[in-house]
């Protein structure tokens, strides 16, 4: 909404881009901790700043080699106004294994489709998805565990009758 928001235009600066980049780094680090192996996250911005787009993806891949950028062009119609991310936009040099993945990201230009323009990357954490425990199965175990616990307490503890005789 940059073009339509005068405050955003006035607040824009190279320093603000770096502040936003740091924020994006923190968001991706948090997302990584929550994602299981085999899981997918979509990173998306509404900025054209390469520092928050291609470069943040390259930085993330460099720091998280257990991720890969998935190519999603096969899911998109031809000539839909989307373009691949550009390695020429990177702010520093990266390893070839990272450079090969940047074209799998997407740029959505406002002059090619309706909207303000965006950037997106589909990131998959390598590995197999592990089963999530079935909570219903866990609940079924609880009554038996409770019964075992009560049996242990009844066998192991002596209940005093003093309260009963004192109140009589």
Identify the meaning behind each predicted range:
Residues 42-167:
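C-terminal catalytic and target-recognition region of SAM-dependent MTase-like enzymes
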Residues 1-29, 35, 47-54, 63-67, ...:
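Mobile active-site "lid"/loop adjacent to the S-adenosyl-L-methionine
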Residues 24-32, 76-83:
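Low-complexity, flexible helical/coil segments
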């Amino acid at each position: 909404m940059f073009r339509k928001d005068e405050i955003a235009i006035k607040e824009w600066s190279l320093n603000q881009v770096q502040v936003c980049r740091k924020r994006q780094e923190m968001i991706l680090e948090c997302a990584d901790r929550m994602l299981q192996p085999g899981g997918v996250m979509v990173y998306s911005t509404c900025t054209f700043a390469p520092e928050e787009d291609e470069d943040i993806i390259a930085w993330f891949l460099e720091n998280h080699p257990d991720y890969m950028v998935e190519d999603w062009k096969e899911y998109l119609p031809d000539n839909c106004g989307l373009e691949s991310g550009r390695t020429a936009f990177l702010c520093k040099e990266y390893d070839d294994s990272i450079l090969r993945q940047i074209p799998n990201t997407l740029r959505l230009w406002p002059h090619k489709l309706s909207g303000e323009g965006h950037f997106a990357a589909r990131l998959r954490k390598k590995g197999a998805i592990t089963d999530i425990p079935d909570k219903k199965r866990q609940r079924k175990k609880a009554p038996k565990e409770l019964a075992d616990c009560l049996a242990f307490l009844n066998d192991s503890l002596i209940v005093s009758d003093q309260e009963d005789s004192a109140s009589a």
